């Protein structure tokens, strides 16, 4: 059994770690609330944009935008949103597993692929994973702006415009609640048709000044908004996962301290018993 002094040192070390994880839990909780507010503010716009674009994809237009045309998938692009920092449980690992599984299914169909990682962990993973990394972004902070992403997204859009990509997806962790964050893969291009029941009405739109000018701008804004929403959702997911992970670490540290305290008490008791035995033996000898 380790000595009482050594055990006491371990207890002090674990207590220091517990203070750190507890502080990180509180910081993550605060950041999560702010991230949720930003996510809630941008989500209605992103969902409305997705719905409108879905109806446009179903409509009969005199101008057929290239983003509406489905072509054979020879090369697939992924915009993968992960975190800049760790200590957030299995958030990034689960996301990467989902991407790898999807890449494998496309690979079996003979398709090639390229990536646009967003977040330091995503950049690190895909540089070692293999496949072309066409663009990347990291260090966006806890409150990114749309302008921070436009250049990165534009690289992938240009590749699609030039026929170098036939499919484009965005991958991120969707925030469900504090305890649940789900990795999702959403198709950006070609535009997915709306699954909304309202599509049965076959909405008809009047375009001013003309369909081409409007759609050329609108569809690019759509892709940018969906990627931005993915980044905002992922930040909220990151803070929630980190808060839960740090709470678990704090609780585990408390359990470990209790166990070490018990061992310390036993060691201390054994030392006292030994000292008493030595005193009694010495007295008997006299």
Swiss-Prot record:
SUPFAM superfamilies in alphabetical order: ATP synthase (F1-ATPase), gamma subunit
Matching InterPro entries: ATP_synth_F1_ATPase_gsu (IPR035968), ATP_synth_F1_gsu (IPR000131), ATP_synth_F1_gsu_CS (IPR023632)
Entry's Gene Ontology molecular function annotations: ATP binding; proton-transporting ATP synthase activity, rotational mechanism
Annotated localization: Cell inner membrane
Summary of subunit composition and partner proteins: F-type ATPases have 2 components, CF(1) - the catalytic core - and CF(0) - the membrane proton channel. CF(1) has five subunits: alpha(3), beta(3), gamma(1), delta(1), epsilon(1). CF(0) has three main subunits: a, b and c.
UniProt family annotation: Belongs to the ATPase gamma chain family.
Protein name: ATP synthase gamma chain
Source species taxonomy: Bacteria, Pseudomonadati, Pseudomonadota, Gammaproteobacteria, Alteromonadales
